[in-house]
Amino acid sequence: MDVKQYLTEWSECYRKDFVENIMPFWMEHGLDRKHGGVYTCLDRDGTLMDTTKSVWFQGRFGFIAAYAYNNIEQNPEWLVASKSCIDFIEAHCFDTDGHMFFEVMEDGTPLRKRRYVFSEGFAAIAMSEYSIASGDKTYAQKALDLFNRIMYMLNTPGFLAPKYLDTMKSQGHSITMILVNTAARIRAAIDAPVLTEQIDRSIKALRENFMSCE
């Protein structure tokens, strides 16, 4: 089997699984049609095990549904699901300081807040992808505004609680990597110098700090 045939067969396999298994499962069992957004703790049979909602997953599913609409199949239900997650995020998942919660109750009541900005990153790419899918450019601007907010939080001493004390300086791989993806996905919807600049900075940091010369 040549490489092209190999990739084609696996691509078709993944597409079939996504369209016929993964999305139907989450649309039927995960989508919260009362409060909005999506439940995140489901058993294999779809049984709801916990009604609390991970905020980062609201953005992730909002992105996945919109990306699937843009690249796999223009299923209107997927677009509605994406918008539901974004609406839930905007209505319930931002604290008064602009930093997002990490976990909320099913109705959006705040439950837990952490020092990360991963919730913001997923929310931003959901908004940018939904902008492309729906044609509503206001969501592209919202994504860019949120990205700028992420950068403010990361670069403002004391805004986010540090993981370690200043005893030893360190740099995390996760945020360096995630900023590349976040900026790239937003850039697909709206171009801004700050996005390309961050991608370049992250790639430079990855090469200098996280890659072995081997």
Residue ranges of model-derived segments:
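Glycan-recognition and catalytic cores of secretory/periplasmic carbohydrate-active enzymes
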Residues: 1-214
